Amino acid sequence: MLRYFRIAGFLFSKEGCYITQNEVNAVFDEQVRLCANTLKRKTKEYTGDDPDRLGAFKAAAALQHTTPQRALAGMLAKHIVSLYDMCFAEEAVYPMDTWDEKITDSLNYLFLLKAIVKEGHTN
């Protein structure tokens, strides 16, 4: 028997289309690994010899006469718009490495935002 459910006006069937909690956990673990590897790889590119890992956001904030949080939010917006466009593209099928790049970069900006917010609360 097919079971249907409705989300935001769309009708979906669960038959043959589900993911287990173990599979979600594996996706999570792989994504965290991708995020960590990317953050490590890009540290030198974005900080040079500056020991402040958040220095690029502070420099961008100074250039834009704003806060590091807002500077980061502007950079994150580009990735979110790209993901949004990918999600709503009618005919396009994107390779997994494109999804990985966009999702990983977006998550890393959120991790860096957390570091900026945390730094602001400790200073």
Where are these regions (language model features)?
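Intrinsically disordered, low-complexity regulatory regions
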Residues: 8-123
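Targeting/processing segments of secretory and organellar proteins
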Residues: 1-3, 7-8
